[in-house]
């Protein structure tokens, strides 16, 4: 596992006035952009990250851990309560339309925030984008920034009509570039063609009108996705229940907890199969004799009691 010191930790620029919009305060350097967290700011707002970072400053949860989550076929039902009990009750969002509902979505969040267009603000942000060499600020600006393993998480504030983030061609490009899927709190179109790619996508609805009357107000900033708060670099976990955004510093602990619970559940079923025990004897605190058996069962499955 490639865990390195946080190279941005001692370069933090003072806080931004509005985190959601990422407005730069007057005390920040001229490199700060109205719609984009710098790597230093990213480190400031993700201080618990134990891993190294991508070039844009997002936490780089190791590919090996993402593969572990995929290979475990981890489910939201196994993780939600763990996050809630750790003080993160607002990481789940359900009630989606889903392409490939039987396939898990796992990857690192690349967040994009839209708002209804306001001309004066949009003019300034377009100027900022041009100054950074991005050209015109639009959906393809963010799409071209995606890396392998990223999941585009797009806050289009639930807009479907005139809220189509991608059609079939851009969806295909995203799949080829990231190898994952997408989360669009907004619209999608050409669903039949996109479905053939096998890419899991969570979206709100379909409409033939292209994206308009919306402006990008944030790239890799904290965003709201329904009732959830997503941070750049969060691990996105999607299944048929919905979506979960897992803070990077909890990923290893969650993997361990899910493994332990699965082994404990397997042991419980094994005891029930004997027909010797009541449910109250297995769930809760086992007797010393049963606890000894459980401890050995866990060791046999590679888990330290």
Name each region found by the language model.
Residues 2-16, 25-26:
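Bacterial N-terminal signal peptides that target proteins for export
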Residues 67, 72-232, 246-305:
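Feature captures the catalytic cores and cofactor-binding loops of soluble hydro-lyases/lyases
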Residues 57, 174, 234-236:
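Buried hydrophobic positions in well-ordered alpha/beta secondary-structure cores of metabolic enzymes
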Residues 60-61, 230:
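Short, isolated positions in well-ordered beta-strands
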Residues 241-244:
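Channel- or pocket-lining gating/hinge segments that regulate access to a cavity or pore
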Residues 33-55, 64-68:
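Short acidic, Pro/Gly- and aromatic-enriched capping/linker segments at domain boundaries
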Residues 21-29:
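C-terminal segment of classical bacterial N-terminal signal peptides
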């Amino acid at each position: 596992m490639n865990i390195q010191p946080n190279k941005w930790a001692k370069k933090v620029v003072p806080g931004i006035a509005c985190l959601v919009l990422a407005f730069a305060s007057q005390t920040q350097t001229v490199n700060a952009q109205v719609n984009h967290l710098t790597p230093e700011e990213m480190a400031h707002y993700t201080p618990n990250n134990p891993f190294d970072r991508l070039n844009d400053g997002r936490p780089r949860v190791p590919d090996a851990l993402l593969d572990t989550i995929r290979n475990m076929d981890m489910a939201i039902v196994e993780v939600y309560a763990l996050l809630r009990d750790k003080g993160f009750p607002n990481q789940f969002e359900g009630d989606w339309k889903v392409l490939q509902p039987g396939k898990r979505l796992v990857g690192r969040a690349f967040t994009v925030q839209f708002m209804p267009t306001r001309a004066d603000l949009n003019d300034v942000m377009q100027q900022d984008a041009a100054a950074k060499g991005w050209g015109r600020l639009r959906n393809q600006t963010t799409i071209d920034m995606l890396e392998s393993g990223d999941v585009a998480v797009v806050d289009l504030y639930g807009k479907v009509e005139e809220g189509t983030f991608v059609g079939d061609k851009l969806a295909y490009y995203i799949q080829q570039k990231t190898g994952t899927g997408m989360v669009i709190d907004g619209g999608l179109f050409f669903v039949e063609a996109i479905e053939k790619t096998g890419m899991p996508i969570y979206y709100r609805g379909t409409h033939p009108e292209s994206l308009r009357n919306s402006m990008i107000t944030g790239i890799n900033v904290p965003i709201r996705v329904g009732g959830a708060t997503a941070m750049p670099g969060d691990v996105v976990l999607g299944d048929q229940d919905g979506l979960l955004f897992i803070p990077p510093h909890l990923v290893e602990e969650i993997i361990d907890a899910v493994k332990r619970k699965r082994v404990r559940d397997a042991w419980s079923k094994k005891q029930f199969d004997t027909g010797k025990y009541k449910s109250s004897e297995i769930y809760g605190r086992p007797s010393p004799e049963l606890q000894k058996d459980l401890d050995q069962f866990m060791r046999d499955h590679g888990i330290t009691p």
